[in-house]
Each structure stands twice: as C-alpha cells, then as structure tokens.
C-alpha cells in the first residue's frame, strides 16, 4: 500500500484516520498482552500498538517476531494516547495496528541506533549507513540541505550564474599536494583533482559571466584534523567590476540569510573588521574567537630591566591573564600547559599567581621591582593566573593564542550560543617558509597587492600587503577571498617574486597569462567552506558529522576500504609501475 505520511508527522488532527506507515523498528516491548513498537522514519518516531483482541493471530505472530531495525509496513487507526509523551512530537497519539508486513529483517547492529552512542569513530564510519539513521545525524543533513537551498536562492536572486567547472584539471602549485589522476590516453601524463576552481572561475570573469557561483567539491592531499577532509565542499563566488567592500557586502547578506532561514537568528550587519596584525598581536591568531576577552599583552619594554635573562634578553615577552583561575591550576596542571606550549615552538612557559596582592610562583622573585607596574599594566586582581612566553614574536603570538583558546574552553568562558563573525583584512601578501627557505603566497599567487605596496614586489616582499579578506566565525576560518590580478605584467611580476622562472610560469600558467592579453576585467571573489559552516551551525566539533561519507584521520574509508590496490592489468593500461618504499 502507499504510505500515507511520515511516521514522525502524525499529529492529534489525524485522530480517527486510517493510515499506512513504513519505517524501521526502533524497539519492541510487551505490556499486559499488548505489543508496543516504536516505528522510526526520517521525520521521527511513532508509537504502534498491537492488541491481540483486534488483530488476526498472524499479525500478532509477526509483531512478536520483530527485532530492532526490521523494516515494516503497518496500517491502522490513529487514536489519542491515554498518557501523552511530551518528549516527542507524536507523543499525543498512537497507531492501533490492523495489518503488518515485514519488508525486511536485520542483523543485530554493532551499536544502538540512537543519539549519544559510544562507538568508535572507525566503527561509525565502517557502518556509516547505520550511523546516519540516528536522529542527530539525520538532522545535520536536513540542516545542510536547508543551508544550500538558502544559499542558492540568495545568489540566484542576485543574478549569479551557477557554472560547473572541471573535475579533471591541470596540476599547479597552489600549496597543498594534489590528488593526481593518470591519463590512459596520454600515458605518463596526469590530471589533478582541483584544490579549488580558482583559475577557471577567474577565466569565467574574462568570459564576461560577471557573477559566478558554484557549490563545488574540492580536493587536497594534506594532513587531516577535525575541520579538514581530503575532499570537501565550498561555496565558490567570483564577480567582475566590484571592489572588496562590495564583495564583502554580498557575502554578509548571504550569511545573514542563511542564519535567518535555518536558525531564526538575526545577524547584525556589517560584520566587524580587524586588521591581520591586530588579530595576531592581541589574539595570537588570524582567526580569532571574539566571544571572550583574554587578550595577549606585550610586556617586552616593562621587563627589560628585570634580573631574569629569559625575559630581559628575549626579543618579545607577552602574557595572558586568566581571571580568577589561580586555584584552578596546580603546578602539575601548569606543567601540562607548558608541554602544550612547546608544541607551538615555545621553549617554556613562565607563570605567576596573584595571592592577596602579592605575586607567587617560580618567576615572582624576579618581578618584585616591577610588581606595581605589572599589576597596573595587566589590571591584575586576586586569584588571577598570568602566563608568559618569551620568544620571537611569531612564536609568542602563536603559543599564547593557542593557550588562550584552550584555557577559555577549560574555564567555560565561551558563550556557545553566540555567532561572532568578523572580517580579517590588511593581510600580508607573502609569508616566509622556513622549510622552503623562501616567501610563499599567504593566500594564492593571483591575489592583487595593494596599490600602496605593489612596488615592493621587486624588493622587500615582507612589505607587500594584499587586497585579501578572510571571514571568521567563532575562531574558525569560514572562508577567504581577495581581489585578483588582471594585468599580465603584474601577474608575471608576482610569479617572479615567488621564485618562478619565466619558463616555469608559462609552463604552469601560460593559459592564464595568455587570457590576460584579451581584456581581462577587474574581478574578485571568495569561497566559503560549506562543511565547516554547517558544522558550526549544527554545534558539532568535527566536519565528519556533516559529511555523509567522510574519511577518517588516515584519509581512509573504513566502509569501502578506499583507498585500495588495483589490478595489475589496470596499472599496465595506464603505463604505471608501483614501487613501495620499505617501511
């Protein structure tokens, strides 16, 4: 029979109606000769009642045979419950079953199909189709669908054109490693799966499309963490003839619409703007979480005269104050914080506690001459904990920034109900790579330098600033964008600054440089990480929770066993020979 409605949508207004439902058995229980079944489908749970006095013996026998996750079809009459269950939307009614059909049986599942399970990540991924049956997972994907629907409606209304760009493209140096696809036709040659549609969307601007968007899969072969996957989805935008503020206005409107449509939240516009240098110096991060204070404070000049070489001879001394936390952290706890600080390059972590107006701790004796100034500078109060890092500026900022985030979580300083957006602007164009021994693009090599600093491309690259902007939400980089270079001579100059020879630049990017001979318009854009955005809206802490079939931390799929070996005949057809290094 045809299903009448979803089980989770049956309500009091359906009382007296005969309906047919289909779904999975959540649980079965007997009471006083009656059998009660929780029938689950994607919209929720409905209680079924099977009374031996009102059904045939065959129906009763089928009901007694049911186990969790059997797939069934039932027909019956909706009645009002004698005792309502206010914990579920269908709790005012139940279905008095008259017929029952078992559509399929099920083995005992490796974990219960319910929220809050304790199964390991790999077990959940191994049986992902079961994991996705759980209501909290299903709700995440309903949210994701609502987000993409809202995005498409917004961009369609602004006359953006949805264009699909190639999945098989050319390998170009963009930062992370490419996933390579060997060509059978052109043996010895490889496609790359795109890390982003960056160049192709710029070429669409040269084609006169004016406003492009795409919700697109991207691929990066990089080390994984909670908010990264080897394949991910981004909301990709590009526009012609707009400046950075106009592009930011469009993105702010998009985000405001998504939050209103999906969460019922009104977002205050415009978003705050913060310079990159300010973010690093006061938050220790280029993606600061502004839901709490605990700012980094520079004490370099104040501690120059103390009799403590770790401070007096350090390039920079910075500190954070954890208000009222002195009694929360024992020496052993601070040792753990010190070990954590060393992960970010710090040599150690100095600390003092405020105890009745006096400083206590290993370095307190060195600070007696500046106690009053230090107390005033840091606005210290009783029971405060002060953590110091003395090192190079970058190390001090990164270390204290990481500690700031960790301590805020441990101290419960974060209001999880807040959605704090901001723009990080005034970016450096380049960042120095110790590993490579050269400057690298902070974003990508197509970013437009500011008019005031472009002349440094032939000199001090540290002075070049970019017309770039990242959007940050609650300490996560939600997306990044920039105005792009549209003049051939400047693009060639940029490649040269990055260490490309003229031959290498034309080998890698000749098609883009050639396109710049044909009236390339001023343009710019942005990409938002869709997985990360939905993760934050859903209140999750790992993007695996909002990706249907993600990989684990080894970039593997425990369900399909991908990646896997392939037959030697396939390798021969591709003219490939695999040599494995000894482990």
Curated annotation (Swiss-Prot):
Please state the Enzyme Commission number of this protein. Answer: 6.1.1.12
**For binding ATP, which residues are annotated in this chain's numbering?**
220-222, 229, 477, 529-532
GO BP field: aspartyl-tRNA aminoacylation
Q: What is a single molecular function from GO for this protein?
A: nucleic acid binding
The lineage's top-level taxon is Bacteria
Concerning Pfam families, the annotation shows: GAD, tRNA-synt_2, tRNA_anti-codon
Q: What is its main location?
A: cytoplasm
- Sorted alphabetically, which keywords does the UniProt record give? Aminoacyl-tRNA synthetase, ATP-binding, Cytoplasm, Ligase, Nucleotide-binding, Protein biosynthesis
Tagged with keyword Lipid biosynthesis: no
Q: Where is this region: Aspartate?
A: 198-201
SUPFAM superfamilies given for it? Class II aaRS and biotin synthetases, GAD domain-like, Nucleic acid-binding proteins
Biological function: Catalyzes the attachment of L-aspartate to tRNA(Asp) in a two-step reaction: L-aspartate is first activated by ATP to form Asp-AMP and then transferred to the acceptor end of tRNA(Asp).
Name of the featured protein: Aspartate--tRNA ligase
């Amino acid at each position: 029979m045809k299903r009448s409605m979803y089980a989770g949508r049956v309500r009091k207004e359906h009382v007296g109606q005969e309906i047919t439902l289909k779904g999975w058995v959540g649980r079965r229980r007997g009471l006083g000769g009656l059998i009660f079944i929780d029938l689950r489908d994607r919209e929720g749970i409905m209680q079924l009642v099977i009374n031996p006095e009102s059904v045939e013996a065959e129906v009763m026998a089928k009901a007694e045979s049911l186990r969790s996750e059997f797939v069934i079809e039932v027909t019956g009459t909706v009645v009002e419950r004698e005792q309502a269950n206010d914990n579920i939307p269908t709790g005012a009614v139940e279905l008095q079953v008259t017929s029952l059909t078992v559509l399929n049986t099920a083995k005992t599942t490796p974990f219960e199909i319910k929220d809050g399970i304790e199964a390991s990540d790999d077990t959940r991924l191994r049986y992902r189709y079961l994991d996705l049956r759980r209501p909290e997972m299903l709700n995440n994907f309903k949210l994701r669908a609502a987000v993409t629907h809202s995005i498409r409606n917004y961009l369609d209304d602004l006359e953006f054109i949805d264009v699909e760009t190639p999945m098989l493209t050319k390998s170009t140096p963009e930062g992370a490693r490419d996933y390579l696809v060997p060509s059978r036709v052109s043996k010895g040659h490889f496609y790359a799966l795109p890390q982003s549609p960056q160049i192709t969307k710029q070429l669409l601007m040269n084609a006169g499309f004016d406003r492009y968007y795409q919700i697109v899969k991207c691929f990066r072969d990089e080390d994984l963490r909670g908010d990264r996957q080897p394949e991910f989805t981004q909301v990709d935008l590009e526009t012609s003839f707009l400046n950075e503020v106009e592009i930011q206005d469009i993105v702010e409107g998009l985000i405001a619409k998504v939050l209103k449509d999906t969460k019922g939240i009104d977002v205050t516009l415009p978003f705050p703007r913060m310079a990159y240098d300010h973010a690093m110096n006061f938050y220790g991060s280029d993606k600061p979480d502004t839901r709490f204070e605990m700012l980094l404070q520079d004490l370099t000049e104040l501690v120059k005269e103390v009799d403590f070489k770790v401070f007096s001879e350090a390039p920079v001394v910075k500190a954070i104050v954890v208000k009222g936390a002195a009694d929360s952290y024992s020496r052993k706890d601070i040792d753990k914080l010190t070990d954590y600080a060393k992960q970010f390059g710090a040599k150690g972590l100095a600390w003092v506690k405020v105890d009745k107006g006096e400083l206590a701790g290993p370095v307190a004796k060195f600070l007696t001459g500046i106690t009053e100034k230090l107390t005033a500078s840091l606005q210290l109060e009783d029971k405060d904990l002060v953590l110091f890092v003395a090192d190079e500026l970058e190390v001090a900022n990164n270390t204290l920034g990481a500690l700031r985030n960790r301590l805020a979580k441990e101290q419960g300083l974060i209001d999880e109900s807040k959605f704090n957006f901001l723009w990080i602007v005034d970016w450096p164009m380049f960042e120095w790579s110790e590993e490579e021994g050269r400057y690298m693009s902070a974003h990508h090599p197509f970013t437009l330098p500011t008019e005031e600093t472009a002349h440094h491309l032939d000199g001090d690259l540290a002075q070049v600033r970019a017309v770039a902007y990242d959007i940050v939400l609650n300490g996560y980089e939600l997306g990044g964008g920039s105005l792009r270079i549209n003049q051939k001579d400047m693009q060639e100059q940029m490649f040269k600054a990055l260490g490309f020879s003229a031959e290498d630049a034309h080998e890698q990017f000749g098609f883009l440089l050639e396109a710049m001979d044909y009236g390339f318009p001023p343009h710019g854009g942005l990409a938002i990480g869709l997985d990360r955005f939905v993760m934050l809206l859903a209140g999750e802490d790992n993007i695996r929770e909002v990706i249907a079939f993600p990989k684990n931390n080894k970039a593997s799929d425990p369900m399909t066993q991908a990646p896997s070996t392939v037959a030697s005949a396939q390798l021969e057809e591709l003219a490939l020979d695999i040599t494995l290094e000894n482990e």
